[in-house]
């Protein structure tokens, strides 16, 4: 089950613990009771997921499994944050706390609400045997969470303007030495407000606010817990070690890997504060002061202190590379300063006035980025990504463009680099390559979009960029490899509900249905069925699939195709024919009953469920006709 060590049973127990938290009779009484009630609605969902057979594994479902893991992890994180928040809010004393403390708790309610709504929105019901009653409960919970998000609105609420003015007494910090070091940072570091900003900040989704786990001043160990741990020994050490508060991003409460200073002098993890700003917030999250500008200045002093602290406590350093060293699998460190010097020299050549120098440098970086994760980390650390993005639009230099987009593809394999690529505004340039580049460049552009779209928030950005229409064009007219790359990217993008309508409007359905009847050696029925199975849950897509006369080829797939394809064909037919007696009669006349009965006996667990559901609907429609 996705989510690592967090099983459905343990999650049910967590929900029970949340519901057992004593009710609050103070300022946050309604917030606490509302959140606990919404969480309680999820019990039956987790129980049915627990009782469902796990989805079958196959090559075509690898991306879907990744998505499944993402939504489950989001749910786990959201529920754990909800428990911590309710425990904090119920013990909140207005008279003993500052206005800022109340605002932080209000901000946490907003963040936890968003996280839970996002997790439920990403749930794909067809992956599990979820009853209609439970679906209605989940949709009710989502509706309530969305309404709550609208109610919380701006963080500059006047709700706490009275009765909360007494200052919070500062506890003696166990990390005073660290704080003193930070306070001694020269003012020049804070005044670097003229540093160049990213030219194209990403249009992060308007409703997204990064999750604030717990913005209390207490250095408790609970906020260090991880839903999934890669190594039990390392996990045990982390649980027993309190990270200095100044090393944690005030928004995410995670150890910072790229600390950046805003105009108020506060430091945040760059990606989180960038998302905060992109959501339209004009104030500093911690101080609520208005930001004079949106320049994010690197805090190199704090980054160095974090590196030293990680080394001292034998903790893996965020970002994988700091101060010229990278951590090996055995826990030892390897010096990469020599490699870094060579890579920096190559990155400098990327901006050379000489076309030949640029071509040579980008070709070498392409080769290096293909070889190892260390190289991908170093190349990104050397600042190559923004320069490579500029090279994507090299006029008339096809070779440089091909190598640049391939470099970005290779770099995106490393998870942290995905974020840097998005922050560099790469999507717009990648889409331009996808539309007008050479075939090799278009293939690699499609593969890059797939890689970037593995992060849920990126699905939204890529979908809004015009990429889907360009991918559909490649799906129809590209090379064999280009078609497969386009299909993979389209499948992943269409997992997000908002992109399904875009794909239909871009004309995706007709080429997919055509692929079902293609008898050539380049047949892509597997890819077509996988994408159609994702689209079919959308009403606009469902109408388009029916208009494309997809039912006959789908029934053919039921009769003679591979097990995975038969499973997807049954799932699509169920979506198309549910609550439509006319369509049920049609598939019965076209010979669907016999292959469905075979599938209900011999298919995968998911295929059996879909086949049995269709057969039951066929029986009901037959009895209904007989009674007329």
UniProtKB/Swiss-Prot annotation:
Which Gene Ontology cellular component annotation is one that this UniProt entry carries? nucleus
- Please state the Enzyme Commission number of this protein: 2.3.2.27
Record GO biological process: protein autoubiquitination; protein destabilization; protein ubiquitination; regulation of jasmonic acid mediated signaling pathway
Residue stretches of each ARM repeat: 373-413, 415-454, 456-495, 497-537, 539-578
Metabolic or biological pathway, per its Swiss-Prot or TrEMBL entry = Protein modification; protein ubiquitination
- Segments forming domain U-box: 242-316
Pfam families hit by this protein: Arm (PF00514), PUB10_N (PF25368), U-box (PF04564)
Among InterPro entries, the record links this protein to: ARM-like, ARM-type_fold, Armadillo, RING-Ubox_PUB, Ubox_domain, Znf_RING/FYVE/PHD
This chain belongs to the protein called U-box domain-containing protein 10
Give the source species: Arabidopsis thaliana
| Upper classification of the organism | Eukaryota, Viridiplantae, Streptophyta, Embryophyta, Tracheophyta
The UniProt gene name for this protein comes to PUB10
